[in-house]
Amino acid sequence: NIDDLHQMAGNKNVLELHGSLKRWYCLSCGKTSNKNFSCDCGGIVRPDVTLYGENLNQDVVNEAIYQIEQADTLIVAGTSLTVYPAAYYLRYFRGKNLVIINNESTQYDGEASLVLKTNFADTMEKVLNIIKK
């Protein structure tokens, strides 16, 4: 997600495969900022997000693959796993527990230790209510 919601929720070490609307850069000189700006060079400034047809940041991709390879448990939630290349990264998981939480079936359900066919947001709300008690 490009909306920074994970960071606002307190998550650390978020890998932004598709970039972030919180960062902007100049296409001409590469100057960056955490807000939209007019570049001194007169170049076009755009948000640091990956649009359809553009390549993902390879450093972020490599780190995502590394983290997946190292994980003992991987929870995949709220995704149909049909958008590539991100859906392909599950092939790197070698851990013990693959958990898929999605309201529809996915192509990886047969490989998962646990599949919960439910709405992720509703499920997390119930989990949080249990934890708060």
Please provide the spans of the model-predicted regions.
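Conserved catalytic alpha/beta core of Sir2/sirtuin-type deacylases, generalized to analogous enzyme cores
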Residues: 2-133
